[in-house]
Amino acid sequence: MPAIEVIQGDVTQLEVDAVANAANTELRHGGGVAAAIARAACPELDSESRERAPIGLGEAVETTAGDMPARWVIHAATMELGGPTSAEIIERATESTLAVAERLGARSLALVAFGTGVGGFPVAEAARLMVGAVRSFPLRSVERVVFAVRGDDAERAFSDAAAEAP
């Protein structure tokens, strides 16, 4: 099982192999974390995203990370464009992100709180689902998972989920 860390921080500045992006199925990065990642990465991220879109709910694909310290951005579809999300989608998107990270040979991965911004999903439930998915997924190459969240409530929710016995 990988080491799990929880931090309040800017996911675009983390020195990890891969950064996860909570995306829509069209891979349009218009708001929230997706927009911040698109701004920090490079123009190639948008063109690579357009080439790979659309993807299904819960699926994940990678692009280059451009000017960010990470090597890859893994875009996980947590909702339709502008639509809500669900527990099943968040869990599937987390598992898909982990599978892509493994395929890429990433040793470290930064995850954001899937579905809790534009998707409107409760942070504590997202934390429980995502930490549970990390613990149960058969990881081989990924040794470190960092949950990069915004705000005290999110940090507390993810820290509590990570502290629970597996």
Q: What are these regions, as identified by a protein language model?
A:
Residues 1-104:
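Glycine-/small-residue-enriched capping loops at alpha/beta junctions
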Residues 81-166:
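Phosphate/ribose-phosphate-bearing ligand recognition and processing surfaces
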